[in-house]
Amino acid sequence: MKKLSLLVLTALAMVACQKKEQVVDDSLFQNVGNPLFRNAFTADPATLVVGDRLYVYTGHDECFEDSIGYEGQYGFNITNWLLYSTEDMQTWKSHGQIFAPTDFAWASGEAWAAQCVEKNGKYYYFLTAQGKDEYNGKCVGVAVSDSPEGPFVDAIGKPLISDEMTDNGPRGWWNDIDPTVLEDEDGTPWLCWGNGTCFMAPLKDNMTELADTISVIPLPKYVEGPWLSRRGNNYYLIYVSMGEGRETISYAMSKSMKGPWEPMGEIAGMAENSFTIHPAICEFKGHWYFFYHNGNLELNGYKGAGGRRSVCVEEMFFNEDGTIKFVEQTEKGISNL
């Protein structure tokens, strides 16, 4: 009887564990405010507009005290990348996991920030992952697909950016993270990335090779998480900056991707219950949106934390001169409910 009870308890524990980490595929849900996605802990949002649909790619936080990986790198256990989409910002679809760092032969794990962009009918997913021993730290990789929903496959079989290609600076072996890509008005794609140092380089038209040398963009209080965007004749380099003890969001502007970049100050404050914050902005159906994450979601008995974050969204606005108005972080977000 004791053996039977033990088996039952073990089975129940396994079911409970599976339930708490489950991400439902192809499910529809309503926007009920921030946090926006409530079926999983999500972080590092990245947006892509394809026709009438907005896609939001996220990292999947699974940093649980009683789970393998809790003592992972710096308290984070970001296991894979998830995908959500919408046509109206109110009804959303969860596509579930699209792929994981371990799908790459050169990577050992850690699904840090990424961005998907379209070029010549293909979808390129620029990502951060932990390289295996020969690469000595975080790397920027690139995957490719015929659809924004995947499946994605490794485009080149090795990292696009690895540790030996950049000056380690203050962040050592994890400075090559958080890639963002934007196409210039002449069709040149530009890659920007970095922790501690903001790196930038043009890409070749094939999206899988650098077209020129890597440059450094000097930005005040720069930490990580760059995001490139364009509106009219203005280019925007939005980035994570250091605030009063935790991260904030600042930005710079330029008339050219080649610079110079003029620092413009903060546009968002510190995230609630999270040391980190990560920006993504986009225009969708006539409105501009600012995506970020905080640590306010409670899910399956687990409270939000620095390693259990949740994606949020606010509408953002511009001044007449093209500068960005400060974005307030709210519980309502853009929900109609």
Regions found by a protein language model. Give the residues of each.
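Bacterial Sec-dependent N-terminal signal peptides
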Residues: 1-27
